[in-house]
């Protein structure tokens, strides 16, 4: 299967190439924007909605009144009366059985959406460009494995078909009947309440036939399941991208295919059938960035890569690491050496001062000993002790103190103490 080519072959009703070629319209090279297609499809689909609303009286067709406070029940309005289960039940609220809904729907909701004309055209261009890529068409689920070429163009004679058997024969010759078989196999019953609303059966989408003039082609193809027919002048994004997804399998007639350049123009020429419309362009012609960056034109303008390796440096504390401190402050070495010298000098001064004080104390003790007339005797450990001075005994502690004999108590004398009169001599 051929991808998008500058020339597209035109196939006859026998499924063979007729020998004619058609230039590929520029719209098939337009940028594919699935986001724009989805946005436009979502908003245009809302224009088919029918307004609906609930009755304004729904949920309020009963007499109910709140009981107020003091009864240990909720203050929701309650049905009045007695003699039935309904009396005393809650009413009106959206949380009550038989009550109204929250925010009852109204018919004056904003049902429709306006979409910019240029944006709608952009979406159609993207959908047409995607229909020419086999990968996107196959990802959409179409069976096009045996189709000879994409986009598929047939002669204008097909527009004059009036019989369905002619249309079926054409699809079989073009190897497109496999897509119709897929539609037949997908026919099933709808799930949900749509069965009760005249939407019982559902099926997949088949090919989209795009023509220029209706000379009976609609009657020939309309009864084949899955087929969609579109006029090239009235392309619809809802049909070209069902569900908002690009990649619809399209079969073109020759005249409709040639008319695309007049409808959407090219990048050199504006559209002749639309006023002031230019075909959207790509931001990049070539999206292969690796090929662009490796091209000689780009490489010639680039500088040589720098091979400098930036290694992570372990941060060290300069207050604890002298080498790092010297990098930050070379004068730190001098400051530290001056500190060491100052400390040594101060230490020497303290030692000298202590020695001088000891010498002065020794001289003073010598003077006292000379005054007493006793020569000082050098004792143990270099201590000077005066001669004739008894050494004080240490107090006894413990068992030794208990073992020593206690001195005998003095006996009381029997002699009477003289009175004051006897002591005093007579005058």
From Swiss-Prot:
PTM-bearing positions, type Omega-N-methylarginine: 97
Chain positions found as Citrulline: 300
Residue numbers bearing the Phosphothreonine modification: 266
PTM annotation: Citrullinated by PADI4.
Gene3D superfamilies noted in UniProt: 3.40.1370.10
Quaternary structure and interacting proteins, as annotated: Component of the large ribosomal subunit. May bind IPO9 with low affinity. Interacts with RBM3.
Residue location of crosslink Glycyl lysine isopeptide (Lys-Gly) (interchain with G-Cter in SUMO2): 239, 327
PROSITE patterns tied to this protein: RIBOSOMAL_L1E (PS00939)
Protein known as: Large ribosomal subunit protein uL4
Function according to Swiss-Prot or TrEMBL: Component of the large ribosomal subunit. The ribosome is a large ribonucleoprotein complex responsible for the synthesis of proteins in the cell.
Biased composition (Basic and acidic residues): 407-427
Lineage of the species this protein comes from: Eukaryota, Metazoa, Chordata, Craniata, Vertebrata
Family stated for the protein in its record: Belongs to the universal ribosomal protein uL4 family.
């Amino acid at each position: 299967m051929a991808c998008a080519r500058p020339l597209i072959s035109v196939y006859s009703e026998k499924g063979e190439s007729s020998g004619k070629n058609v230039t590929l319209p520029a719209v098939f090279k337009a940028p594919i924007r699935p986001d724009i297609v989805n946005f436009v499809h979502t908003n245009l689909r809302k224009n088919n909605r029918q307004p609906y609303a609930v009755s304004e009286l729904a949920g309020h067709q009963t007499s109910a009144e709140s009981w107020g406070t003091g009864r240990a029940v909720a203050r929701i309005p309650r049905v009045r009366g007695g003699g039935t289960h309904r009396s005393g039940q809650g009413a009106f609220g959206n949380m009550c059985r038989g009550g109204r809904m929250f925010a009852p729907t109204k018919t004056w909701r904003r049902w429709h959406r306006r979409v910019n004309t240029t944006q709608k055209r952009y979406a159609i261009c993207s959908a047409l460009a995607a229909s020419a890529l086999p990968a996107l068409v196959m990802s959409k689920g179409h069976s096009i494995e045996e189709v000879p070429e994409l986009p598929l163009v047939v002669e204008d004679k097909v527009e004059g078909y009036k019989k369905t058997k002619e249309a079926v024969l054409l699809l079989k010759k073009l190897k497109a009947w496999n897509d119709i078989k897929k539609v037949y196999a997908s026919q099933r019953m709808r799930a949900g309440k749509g069965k009760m609303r005249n939407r019982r059966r559902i099926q997949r989408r088949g090919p989209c036939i795009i023509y220029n003039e209706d000379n009976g082609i609609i009657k020939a193809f309309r009864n084949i399941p899955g087929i969609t027919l579109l006029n090239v002048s009235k392309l619809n994004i809802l049909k070209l991208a069902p569900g908002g997804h690009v990649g619809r399998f399209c079969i073109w007639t020759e005249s409709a295919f040639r008319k695309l350049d007049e409808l959407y123009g090219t990048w050199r020429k504006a559209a002749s059938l639309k006023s002031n419309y230019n075909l959207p362009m790509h931001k990049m012609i070539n999206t292969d960035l690796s090929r662009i960056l490796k091209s000689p034109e780009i490489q010639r303008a680039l500088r040589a890569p720098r091979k400098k390796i930036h290694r992570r440096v372990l941060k060290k504390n300069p207050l604890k690491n002298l080498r790092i401190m010297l990098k930050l402050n070379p004068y730190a070495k001098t400051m530290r050496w001056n500190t060491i010298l100052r400390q040594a000098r101060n230490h020497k001064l303290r030692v000298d001062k202590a020695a001088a004080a000891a010498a002065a104390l020794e001289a003073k003790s010598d003077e006292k000993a000379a005054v007493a007339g006793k020569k000082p005797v050098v004792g143990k450990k270099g201590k000077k002790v005066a001669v004739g001075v008894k050494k004080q005994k240490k107090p006894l502690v413990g068992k030794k103190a208990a073992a020593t004999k206690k001195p005998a108590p003095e006996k009381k004398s029997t002699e009477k103490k003289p009175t004051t009169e006897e002591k005093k001599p007579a005058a």
